[in-house]
Amino acid sequence: ASGQFDEDKISQGGLRITSTIVKEHQEQAVAAAEGMNEVEGWDPTHQHVALSSMDPATGEILAEYAGADYEKRQQNAVTQDIAMAGSSFKPFALLANARLGGTVYDTYSGKSPQYFRGMGTPVMNDGGYSFGNVTLVKATAYSMNTVFVGLNDDVEPENTLKAAIDAGIPEDTVGLNDELLNVLGPSSPHNIDLTTAYSTIANGGERVTAHIVKKVEDSNGKLLYSGDVAPKRVFEVEEVSSIMPALEAVTKGEGTAANVDSAIARLTTAGKTGTSSDQLSAQFVGFVPGMVTAVSMYQSDDAGNSVPLDDVGGLDQFHGGDWPVDVWIDYMKPATANLPGDDFPWKVESNRKVHNNAPTPAPSATSEAPQSGAEPTETPAPTETPSTEPTENSENGGNGNNGNNGNGSNNGNGGNNNGNGSNNGNGGNNNGGNNNGGNNGGRRN
């Protein structure tokens, strides 16, 4: 909407701007995000939470926590900060595989370490965890790097890249590439980009544009602008339906976000965690019918450079399945209370045939499977990083970019109903709430 109204028209006054923000959801987002302030070792002056919540059918942003205090930090964490995607990028390989006729019941070797074509350094799962042949459902639930690099080798990295862009990851995202390890998320999107891309999945393959201005009227009530956007089909319904068992496995059982299913038992839940290998960032993008929410966490020093999220809450390591999931639950549990239905209405039966049976891997040392919350990490070759961006390693390695200098815009909210002050860093009414709520759930390794 900002491009349709110049400064002269805005300064003349008389415009009535309505945002998409739902006051109750905004309050819930602030309470959930600022619950991190109660966690031992968490310092909101350097450690940041970004949360965006969207209606996947319309693209309307329902809530946005973009920083603790805009007067102290003039940076929108949702639309300007960037953080390494890590394993939150893996679903795009599942989509690429589905486009080629594959199924999430295809099997691959989960052996760790593994060497792949053109690589002098092996790919590893977190902590040296090694598995036998597993389906992509289990590999997604456990976030196995070796399996997903093997999958990416089969589907070809450029197809994973295309799936990500089609879903909603901008083509100019820092670190986005068509190399074999792109599946491990060396790219650094904005929080809102992940919300948008996962909304495409949650909407059965139709992509919508994220927006925070619902409508603009003049002083006489004449409609000057409407944020309504027509969805664009980028994946077939059957393709998206076919990958859902893998994404649903993440949020239950032994998945890296297993607490989600029991917390929101009334609705079908799905999503993916993501963590950088040096704990420079951690995030969880999860969705239910009618709502998608991404939670990103990262840390910067006084110079704006990314530094590890360590010494937080007594944990040795910081994963997407830890506090990002907790904050997601703290927000989504009340926010979804009035959503209708229990499953995604667009889902169809998928009768795909398994077309890949992995060879039996050579014997290797196998250790106990990771517990819920932990997810595998791996170190690929570094990617080039602009000097203006702080560097950050993906969950799987690579020098990417976190935090402070993303190339996004400020979502230019200007809305008149932004609820309470999550300090969205937008131009709108941040009605400064006094929120310190949000209880932090039990810790998981």
State the predicted function of each range.
Residues G120-G128, E156-T196:
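Mid-domain, small-residue-enriched loop/turn segments at the edges of structured enzyme/sensor domains
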Residues A1-T18, A31, G41-Q47:
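Non-catalytic structural connector segments
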